[in-house]
Amino acid sequence: MSVTSEVQGLRALNEVDPEIAELIRLEERREADTLRLIASENYVSRAVLEATGSVLTNKYSEGYPHKRYYEGQQQVDVVEELARTRVAKLFGADHVNVQPYSGSPANLAVYLAFAQANDTIMGLGLPAGGHLTHGWSVSITGKYFKSVPYGVRESDHRIDLDQVRDLARAHRPKLIWCGTTAYPRTLDFAAFRAIADEVGAILAADIAHIAGLVAAGVHPSPVGIADVVTSTTHKTFRGPRGAMILCKKEHAGAIDKAVFPGLQGGPHNHTTAAIAVAAKEASEEGFRAYARQIVVNAQALGRALESRGFRLITGGTDNHLLLIDMTPKGIAGKPYAQALDRAGIVANYNSIPFDPRKPFDPSGLRIGTPAVTSRGMGVAEMERLAAWMDEVAQNVNDEARIARIAAEVAELCRGFPAPGIRL
């Protein structure tokens, strides 16, 4: 083996690092042979994968298009401009920034743009379905700001807008978040806007979970209502692991300055390219049909589970996810999620509103339909899935039965090939 080939990196992955190559192969097989119900996961297209793994990862590009600190940006500037203009057109936004590395940095940029340390902020509490970065105590956002969390009603587990209004009037927050990670109902952005206006707060909408549904017109859009909108670019958007910030024209300078140089250095250009590809895909009619089917499947799965004795938080869903209280089934969320995983059905245990159990061993399970819908599955498959989930719930310790279900799941998966995976 020549020194030149060693230094130049001419060898393939399976030659250089067979251990990592084998782990990737095993992950491809796992993703192909299991039903992925984690609401924040999805399959990206082959085109998105190709962009993510491109030579654009080699280029450093501090700054913004045509205002860089490095030369050699001829292609990169065009890539970023395409990503920004495609996202702006898709959502009807005045201004777009596609440089945040992920959802949490995007949210931190919003704080940097609009708030000072110790300012009061409001967001949905984590136990009620909110996100860590909306001011929860263990997050840096809960340590650097005075966080006033709002919640959901105990009667129906829907966001308590009366409480939001009362808390806003009492605490006069600088910033109000409306966004969720485990909330299956439509968000009333206009109601949040009215509350923010009453107290003079900036309204920030975090649509990380529902961006694909918003882009397709399946969920109401906060663009033009909220001052600023953040989102990851994976989940229902089916893009790479990145993020984007959409805002009104008057906030463009503050947002861009907060992202760079406020929080980050050079953007990940390979991710930017993949965001551009995902935005192009999301603009097509096929994506709109796909987004509609996500919701149809989630509602069908919810009905099928409810008919089998599962208790759905809020009684159903308007979007891509379901939150389930496992108490009536006599099993906690964690052991149930682990049993499902052995059966080839991948979900995550999750706290439910007013959960008496601890977060690492909660009462609930969160599931979503983006990934199974990406495989082309429909209502009939949701019925089969509910039957398997019920069988597992009743036979958590029956490993022979669970192994049989796993084999049946793998057989179903072979009929619906996973996008982007070539075995």
Swiss-Prot record:
A GO cellular component entry from the record: cytosol
Localisation per UniProt entry: Cytoplasm
Primary site of residence: cytoplasm
Enzyme class: transferase
GO terms under biological process: glycine biosynthetic process from serine; tetrahydrofolate interconversion
Keyword Hydrolase: no
Assigned keywords, A-Z: Amino-acid biosynthesis, Cytoplasm, One-carbon metabolism, Pyridoxal phosphate, Transferase
Site residues (Plays an important role in substrate specificity), renumbered to this chain: 234
Gene3D superfamilies tied to this protein: Aspartate Aminotransferase, domain 1, Type I PLP-dependent aspartate aminotransferase-like (Major domain)
Residues that bear N6-(pyridoxal phosphate)lysine: 235
Family: Belongs to the SHMT family.
Pfam families per UniProt: SHMT (PF00464)
Binding-site residues, (6S)-5,6,7,8-tetrahydrofolate: 126, 130-132
Summary of the function given for this chain in its UniProt record: Catalyzes the reversible interconversion of serine and glycine with tetrahydrofolate (THF) serving as the one-carbon carrier. This reaction serves as the major source of one-carbon groups required for the biosynthesis of purines, thymidylate, methionine, and other important biomolecules. Also exhibits THF-independent aldolase activity toward beta-hydroxyamino acids, producing glycine and aldehydes, via a retro-aldol mechanism.
Cofactor(s) this protein cannot do without: pyridoxal 5'-phosphate
Enzymatic reactions: (6R)-5,10-methylene-5,6,7,8-tetrahydrofolate + glycine + H2O = (6S)-5,6,7,8-tetrahydrofolate + L-serine
Recorded GO MF terms: glycine hydroxymethyltransferase activity; pyridoxal phosphate binding
UniProt subunit comment: Homodimer.
EC id: 2.1.2.1
Record has Transferase as a keyword: yes
InterPro entries documented for this protein: PyrdxlP-dep_Trfase, PyrdxlP-dep_Trfase_major, PyrdxlP-dep_Trfase_small, Ser_HO-MeTrfase, Ser_HO-MeTrfase-like, Ser_HO-MeTrfase_PLP_BS, SHMT-like_dom
Family annotation (SUPFAM superfamilies): PLP-dependent transferases
UniProt-recorded name of the protein: Serine hydroxymethyltransferase
